[in-house]
Amino acid sequence: MEKAKLTKNLKLKIKNAQLTKAAGLDKLKQKLAQAGSSETKSSSEKPSTKVPEKIAKEKVVKKKSVVDPGVPTMTEPVSAENSPRRIRAKNHSSFVSEDLNSPQPPVPVDSDASAFSDSAVVEEVDSFVETEQEISVSTPPPPVTEETEVVAKEPPAPKKEPEVVVKKEPPKSVVSIKSNFGPTGKHINHLLAKTFKAPKKEDKPAPKEKTKTTQTKPQQSSDASNDKHHSPTNRTSQPFYRRDVSKKSGSDFRDRAKKDDNPKAFTGRDRYGLNDSSDDDKWRKKRVQKTKKHYEEHAIQRPTHIKVPLPITIKDLAAEMKLKASELIQKMFIHGMTYVVNDVLDNETTVQFIGLEFGCTIDIDSSEQDKLCIESNTVKEEIQETDPSKLITRPPIVAFMGHVDHGKTTLIDSLRKTNVAAVEAGAITQHMGAFCCSTPVGNLTILDTPGHEAFSAMRARGAEVCDIVVLVVAGDEGIKEQTLEAVKHARAANITIVVAINKCDKPNFNADTIYRQLAEIELLPEAWGGTTVTINTSAKTGEGLSELLEMLALQAEVLELKANPSARARGLVIESELHKGLGAVATILVQNGTLHLGEALVFNDCYGKVKTMHNEHNQLMKSASPSIPALITGLSSMPKAGDPFVVVKNEKTAKEIVGARLAGQQKFALQKKRPNFDAMLQNKKILKLIIKADVQGSIEALANSILKITSDKVSAEILANSVGEISESDIRLAAASKAVIIGFHTGIESHAESLIKNLGVKVQLFNIIYHAVDAVKEMMTALLDPIAEEKNLGSAEIKETFKSSQLGTIYGCLVSEGTMTRNQKVRVVRGNEIVWKGNLSSLKRIKEDVKEVKKGFECGILLEGCQHAQVGDILQCYEVIYHPQKL
């Protein structure tokens, strides 16, 4: 209990001392201390005290610093020369009594300091009761003004003497350094966190040497809490000196635990300050800030001469010139050319002009095109460059052209002794036919072209491939529209024209009229002194056919038609179709060289290897010489009519060439079809169609005819077209896009017929092209909303109105004009303004329902939903008639 009271008093005094210092009373205490020291110097020395024999420990007296009561002063140990003999403490009572009876020198300090020192001495004596260590008493050394680090030395062996006389000198004023000790007795430097620089990775920190120093605690502790960590049994008998506050002794003292090398990760709680910031183990992890990389801009050296292929996009051209695409677009816009980044430039002049604007010379690289271009020159140029000794005379290719129903096919049948016209649908030719015909004057290759207006492309191809054009004109009808078109194609190809005036057996045949019409189109006949050969023929009687053959042979001799049969085969595709069992087949015409079985062919976008070859009579052929048509199989896909072909080394080479061509086409092809903005703005309706035909030429002819149908109200759009029968995929496409399938000279697959009924797809099949075109026109017209027309039937004037709780207002009227009919439309006219329109729901005359009331009779009329008609209004009865619109 006494110890607890002393501890409590000690804490209160320490706190008072701190408050005194904070209030500025330490200066006053310093003056009082100086006054007390002067009085001490004048006083005489007191007699020395004898140390009892029982006390064997070194008596250490601590003096409180006058300047700072919280800092202990230097200890005053007794000199080793006057050390007494060692004795043992017997018991607690004897030790305390002897210690209390011994006189103590007075210490000149204030009341607070004296109380503090007395309590400290009592506590120290109490702590030595149960120890049996040896102590020595020595004289105190003179006080020092500077603090020095003192290392405890081993005490000398004590001498056994019964009594030791200690002479005390008057205490001198000790100049102590003011240190910032807190209530725990620790220096402020020991409490602050110390920062240590992390050693470099390559330099390892040197290990610290452990100094073997004995660290002693002061016998008069400044805080009772220190006793918890330092028990009395652990105290040593070494002399205790004043702590050196400027230097550390022993191991480093840290107030907190060492930081963990692997700290806790930074979390969201740390971001919002939710974690305890006082916990030193948790500290914010600094984020590594990403430093922006600054790249040095080097001067770009733009080339002055480049070589680019064609076609090329704006983006690729800018990359080759080391420019931005926007710079090229801006420069071209200044010169009136509008382009975007992905636009393709295929004009050599435009590309070179752009290069000159930026000081760069651009050459066109044609190496890739040379690899793909296996035919560097035309067939005629190739024949002209061939050695004349290798050339032979080839049969002439004769194309019969003219207007529809003028007798072209019948005339050819007469020459070939066949009857092709009898089996043609509608008695018109809708395919191009190639035949090899033997005549008394030699062999002829005859091309039969369609005369219908839809087959303009076929006639153009026929004019390009043939050597002589036979213009067939009916003597009873004269020159028609397609006749003029055939003349135009022949002149464009610079081909000799022979006019056959057909149907000379008819009674209304007039050759002079044909001569006059030919002269009008600058084809002056020989009979009128011109150069155009004209022959009167009749396909039925055979009149004039021999003269026609002789003239064809004569023209062939004049043209000197030659070819090289030993060269690689080259020619054109006359027609192509998809056969059920053979796949893609094509009718070709060899223009130069000889085509053999097993040779590889390259078309524009497909290739193939000749597996089979047939003539017009379906007979197998091993080879096809110049000017000979043939039907071949073994193609990868269907070539387009009019595509040229050439023989290459092998099928692998053909595949590589076609693959490179397709890659180039896909690279610069439009990915999406541009919408028809004009149709959207005009709210035009669109008829969607899917075309299926037997041959490629028929698809081309039918599509061109449909697209020629022009209207401001509706338009036709062809979603897809292909050769072959109508399949399930075509039906599903039509159902998804709400399109109509048009089949021309083709049928429907057997397993696809049930799908047509299930999906409700509209399919129409035709064998004659103008029937198909007329059907498309009707479907386009059906899309248009009919035009409504109001036809007046009669009128009546309201004379009286009657109110009915069940029916509403009943109007008593007099028919003034025409007839008032039940269930027709009625207008209520007041003055010149129509105030209501609706239906006439009930019509009565003398309480009887009637269908109509004529002029001059009275009637009762009930209008559906009309309650505001007045006496004097006119009721006009009319009916609505809808008329279909026209394209």
From Swiss-Prot:
This is Translation initiation factor IF-2. The gene is infB. Residues 502-505 are annotated as: G4. Keywords: Cytoplasm, GTP-binding, Initiation factor, Nucleotide-binding, Protein biosynthesis. NCBIfam families: IF-2 (TIGR00487), small_GTP (TIGR00231). Residues 448-451 are annotated as: G3. CDD domains: IF2_eIF5B (cd01887), IF2_mtIF2_II (cd03702), mtIF2_IVc (cd03692). Residues 427-431 are annotated as: G2. It comes from Chlamydia caviae (strain ATCC VR-813 / DSM 19441 / 03DC25 / GPIC) (Chlamydophila caviae). GO terms for cellular component: cytosol. Residues 213-223 have a biased composition (Low complexity).
